[in-house]
Amino acid sequence: MANKNVLSEMDDLMAELGLVETTATPTSDQIKQPQQETAPTYLTYKDPNVSTGPGGDFRNLNDNNGGISRGPGLMSTGPGLVSTGPGLMSTGPGLMSKGPGLPNNSINNNISNNNGGGISSGPGLSFGVSSGVSSGVSSGVSSGVSSGVTLVAQNHLARQPSPPLNSQQQQQQQLPTYLDGVGTLQPISLAATTPDGRVVKANGPICGACGDMIIGVCTNALGRSYHPEHFVCTYCKLPFSGSFIEHEEKLYCENDYLELFSPRCFACIKPIEDTCINALGNRYHPECFSCSGCGDKLRGKPYKEEDGEVYCNTCKIARQKRLAAKSEICSKCKLPITGEYIILQGQPVHSEHYRCEECGCEFNVGKTCHEYEGRLYCYEDYQKQILNICGACSKPIVGRSITALGKVWHPEHFTCTTCQVPFAGSAFREHAGKPYCESHYHQFFGRQCFKCSKPVVDTGVEVFGKIYHREHFTCTGCECVLGKEIMEWDGKPLCFKCFDALPKEVRKRIKEKKAGDKKAEAYREKLAKKEAKELKKERERAAKEKEKESKAK
C-alpha cells in the first residue's frame, strides 16, 4: 500500500512538472513517422555529487540529501512504467516523453531485473523524479525535494534540442540516407560538435555540377564527383542510360552529342557517326557521296568537280560534250561557258578570268583595266610594270638607276643601312635584304680575330673553334707564325718546340685528349652520314607515295 502511495505521489509530481502526459497510446502512424530521421546519441553529464550503481550516472541537484542513489533493486522505466522495487506494477499506461523529436517507439518496453535497474530512455526523453530514491535493495522512494535525473538527447546539428516537428515538417527535412541492416532507408546525421564542445567540420567531395559538398551516395566520373540527381546529360537533363560522352568538360548522352557536335553530311544534312568523306570542302556519308549524273557511289573512285557538283569521269566528259555543242568556249581556259561571260578583245572569256594578273582584284563596273604584254592589270599594278620604283623612297625612277638585291635604286639612295654613305660603285655586303659597307657588316655580323679582336674581312685561319688573322695565328709560347702542323694546349695553339718543353705528364694528357677528340669527331661524322642516308630514303619513299596518289587521281 505504501508503495502505491509513493508511485501515485511520483506520478502527480511528474504531471505537475510537465514530464508525464496522460494521453492515449500513440498510433501506428505516429510510430512509423520518425523512422526516416536519424536517431540522436545521448550524453550523460557526470557530476561529483552523483552516486552511481549498476545502470547509469545521475546528477544530484538536491542540497538537502534528496539526490538519487542507485541500488541493485531499482527498476528501469519503460513506456508508462515507473517501478521502485522488484515486481512493482506500472502506475499507468501511455507515458509520453517530453524531449524534442522523440520517436514514440524508442522507449524501452522491458522491465530490468533487480541487478540491472537503470532508467532507460529513447531519443529526446527528459525524465525527472520528484523525490530522491534512498539506498538499499527495493527501498522505494524517500521524501525530500530533488530535481532527479535528466537525460538530454544530443542534437547532431546543435547543442540545444529543437522543438518537435509535425509530420509535414519531417517530410520536408532532406537529409542524406543509408540502408540499415533490414533494408530500411535511414537518414544520415552529421555531428556539429563533439561531446566536449569541439567543432566538427564535415569533409566530403564537391559536386562537379552544383559545387556543394556531397554527403552520402555519390557518382564518380572523369575525376569528379556528382550528386546522383546531378549526374545527368547537360542538354536534355536526363540520367545516363549506361554511357556518356565528355565534351569541353561537360557530359552528354550519345544522342545529344551526335546532334550537337557531330559533323553533318552535306547531302542529307544528318549527323555523321562513323566514316566520312571530305571532298570539295564538305563532308559526306560514304553512301551519300555519289555522282550527280549517274548516281554511282564515288567512294574510292576518281571524280571531277563541275559547278559545285561531283561527277565520275564518264559523266564529266559527256557533260562537257553536251555543253560544248551549244555553248561558247572560253579563250583562256578552253572550257565551255555555261553562265555569264565577257567579250575581251573579241573573244569570250569566263567572268572569273576578268581580273588583275598581279593582285587578283576583279574589274567591276566603273573600274578600268590596262593591258601590258598580253596581260591585264589594274591601274596601280600597271604603273608598277611600266615604271621603275626606287627600293628606298618608293618613287618612280627617271634617269640613272642602280639594280641590286633584286630592286632598282636611285644612285643617291643606294647607301649603307648604318652610316647612310652611298656605295658609289664600291663593294657592299648584304644581310637580311639590306646593304652594308664592309666595316659595318663585319662590325655587326662578321667574326672577330681571337687575338686582336678586329673583324676578319677576307680569309682567316679557323682552328679550335676560333678564327685568326693569318698574321696573328702564332704560337702562344714563342710567338712564331704557325703553319699547318700545330699542337693544342688549353685551347691555344703551340709549336712543336714549345710543346716538347712542357712537362711529360702534361704532354701525355694533351695527346690523350687529342686522340679522344679525333675519335669523337669520327663518330659524329659516322652519325651524320647515317642520318643523311635515312633522310634520303625517307624522301624517296615520300616521292613514291606522292606519285601513287597523283596516279590514283
Swiss-Prot record:
Tell me any Pfam family this protein matches: LIM
- The signal peptide annotation in the UniProt record is none
Instruction: State one molecular function term (GO).
Output: zinc ion binding
Biased-composition ranges, Low complexity, are 99-114
| Cellular compartments annotated | Cytoplasm, Cell cortex; Cytoplasm, Cytoskeleton
- Region annotation (Disordered) maps to 43-115, 534-553
Alphabetical UniProt keywords: Chemotaxis, Cytoplasm, Cytoskeleton, LIM domain, Metal-binding, Repeat, Zinc
Protein's recorded name:
LIM domain-containing protein B
Q: What is the lineage of its organism?
A: Eukaryota, Amoebozoa, Evosea, Eumycetozoa, Dictyostelia
